[in-house]
Amino acid sequence: TESAVKLPSSSERDYIGTPRAEGFVKRYLSEDGAPAFGFVGLLPVDKNEDIFDFARSLDGGEWMDMWNKKSGAVRVKLPEFGFDYKVELKDVLAVLGVTDMFDPGKADLGGIADCAMSCSRMIHQTHIEVDRNGTRAAAATAAVFDSAAMSSDKVLVFDRPFMFMIVDYATGIPLFIGVVTNI
């Protein structure tokens, strides 16, 4: 099935263009007027490249090279979208070797509690919403403890799967990363 999607447009100052990807940065300013955060949209140059393969293959060095070479203005048409994501972290942390805190016999959480306790669950949840009014993003992690007791000639149209990021504008370090597949 096909559906009509509104693609609000905007002029942005930071165009990203490399042999592998094209994109933009939408700046979000702090109270003093300096860029504090940026929303990044990236499209693989190869229209047939799977967006998940593209996102997986983009390493830190390549990303920082893109970030450091951003230049010029671009006109952007980006769909409005929103996502919620929730994950139980116990198994994820176990893969990373973090297991003792979940074992009542091994947990040593004396730095945060006066009694013997262990963590029974850890949940991470994120939310992002992008629309014509801007970007809203939030993330929270909860643990359950148990005690023994501008204008341009360039135009980018995001009308196919793409990758997005929220980045610290001063460093370019990604704070949120995701992909949009249903356009």
What kind of feature is each model-predicted range?
Residues 1-183:
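Mature hydrolase/peptidase catalytic cores and their serpin-fold inhibitory cores, especially
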